[in-house]
């Protein structure tokens, strides 16, 4: 498949944006059979209440005709004509003719609102042709409504994907859209875009020389870096864009995902210092709801606002329905009752920005909100670009419509989150997931998680196998496997990554064995030797746990450094008065059991004889004492 150079794509996108603003209010439409070929209303999309109506009706005829008449009406929302004008021309050839109409809006005595222009064209020998277009009349005193546009690059991880032309094309589209997005943010700072890119994509592009499209990945990263340097905010995100509702109770996983996401951001933007992408306090939870417990973990890690879905927000009683809320988080997660601003994405408005054909309807809806008595604090629009979204060029065209209207004030996410007087809300702890993963998916993840975390604890986070297994595990938790339609059509790839992570962990930890034979102590106390054989070829740090109901274990847990080969450790125990007992010995790493054995501990025969003799001597002495005293009394 032939691909255009990046410069050509960028030029085409810029040209499309430039042309969008000059389109007429109603495109030409073919008329019925007759002399009139087409009729077009030429009008602005909006004008001020104190402005001038400068309108036109363009008529194209098929052949010469004796007479063509055009009338134009301005209809209010009830369909009542508030202004009517009529013009007629005779002896027209096969030409394009434009009827011009002009009138001061103030003379019409109309109020601000949404009106409909209706043109009717008649000609000799043909039926009337009718066309309509929308016209918004705005009062200059109307306060613009803040609109924050967050553009996210959306695609599934490439890890574990079978190489194919389709996969290569998807990767190319994603990287190209990301590059175009960076250029759009730099060339049009007035759009005040906020960007969100899953960190795993940044990591893939950072190692673009290993991918099938190295140049386009590098271009995407370079373009985003320039946008960040220009001051475009970039939201933080967890490494694999995980399903937060599914791992909400696994705090260690959440912290690991956030830490790895931050590391990927820092690696992708090494020279940005305190740029928004690196030091951002905003978080993108755009693949599903944000549970309250997850928000508390994020708040403890420096997040002050989050962009997420509306399904997890529960407005306080009496609070206005809005798209920006102040949420107080629980204090039992280290956040001390911190307040986080939640920017809830408007699904309907977001859909209007995905297609340039719907942008005018979105602008009209925003006008209605701006003119209403209950104005929103902010409207949050989230749109996806990339393989799982729309093209950046389409978003650019739609944005041009919003950027040109006076009732919309585009703001970035940090500015929207900084608004005062936000309504109060809470976050649901267990928001409903309309598209859950297939049965058994998260059980497989949980099994792999125990093994991988054990490997990381034993071998260290810098170990090659540990890092590979952890990456696979975190990617397996990605919500991207659900796909843009939520069908989880890619679930098999996520499960394959989880199983691969577990196998990597087993390949290392499975080489640790435990040999703990039965032992006879020389006395009632002693040390039980335990042999741990480490055949992994690397140094591991594990916990040696000992427990028993019949033997008193003097040290139940010992941290042990296992060097390659045999390692002998001792467990101090005491039998007390018992002659024998059983003790369980476990080798664990971060709670994951690597090996286990049961040891029988007995005291030596000589020790038991000495103990028995001592008891008999004591008993004999007591008996002699009793007999002497009783004899004297007798």
Where are these regions (language model features)?
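Active-site beta->alpha N-cap acidic-glycine motif
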Residues: 127, 131-226, 233
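Catalytic grooves of carbohydrate-active enzymes
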Residues: 58, 183-189, 263-276, 288-314, ...
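Contiguous beta-strand segments within globular domains
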Residues: 36-62, 66-68, 521-529
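Intrinsically disordered, low-complexity Pro/Gly/Ser/Thr-rich segments with frequent PxxP/GP/PP motifs
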Residues: 78-110, 554-582
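Proline/serine/threonine-rich low-complexity linkers at boundaries of modular beta-sandwich domains
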Residues: 27-38, 501-510
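Terminal connector regions
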Residues: 107-134, 497, 577-615, 620-632
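Membrane-proximal extracellular "stem/stalk" segments
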Residues: 471-472, 480, 485-607
